[in-house]
Amino acid sequence: MGLKSYQKKVIADLTRYLELLNETKSDAAAFRLFWQEKSAPTLGLYQNVIPGVPNLCFKVPTGGGKTFIACNAVRPIFDALPATKTKAVVWLVPSDAILTQTAKALKDTSHPYRQKIDVDFGGRVEVYTKQELLNGQNFNPTAVTEQLSVMVLSYDSFRGRGKEVLKAYQENSNLAEFAKVLGKPDSPIEKADETALFQIINQLNPLVIVDESHHARSELSLEMLENFNPCFVLDLTATPKKESNIISYVDAVQLKNEHMVKLPVIVYNRDSQSEVLIDAIDL
């Protein structure tokens, strides 16, 4: 499955920003220059959500293929960042239903999402759920240095202090080898054991993809994002919040032109020409 023309534009926008980031070595300067090139300098005010961490947003309507766009964004992001021993992706989703759907698609080697990532990373890809990570199932220091590790996780299983969240903070003998290999963390998580899953992910310095990111703007959500110790944050949403650093917009008309969505035809009777003109301006 190839990218639609509007999806190609999103990836092109990302690629241009990454080029500017490498030239300027500044998240904010690259963002400002990007929108200056688009003749829209007023859009170039960068919101420093996590200091020192690039944070971008794709604004794509529901049904626009956000997940497939994100799959195509992983390789360009890693290519633009400094080389590291490990390549890890935390793919955050807002609900159990989306978690199941996303994990199933990314684990299926015949699915276009997984096929794209496999092509970009030479088939050396492993996709994990939280339980598989907690169990250390094919998740060890050797594996993560030889593959792209994609961890599909829900906000609620790492946000707050609930029973399910605490599992990620607790001592975990299944992951003890990581603590030996990775050593003391540079960014230790408060109240997390050095063998805890959350702390291990933190030390892998992952790319974090936030699906439906408008649900992840509370203080607890931002604390969660910081604890992941991301190298880059990519937000996906149809309804971005004001602090989002939107790098590419897709509107419903572009989806309609690509036959991705059918827009309804709504007809109203108006009593005068002036009312018609007023409604047209409002629309």
Q: Positions of the model-derived regions?
A:
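RecA-like P-loop NTPase motor core of helicase/translocase proteins
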Residues: M1-L283
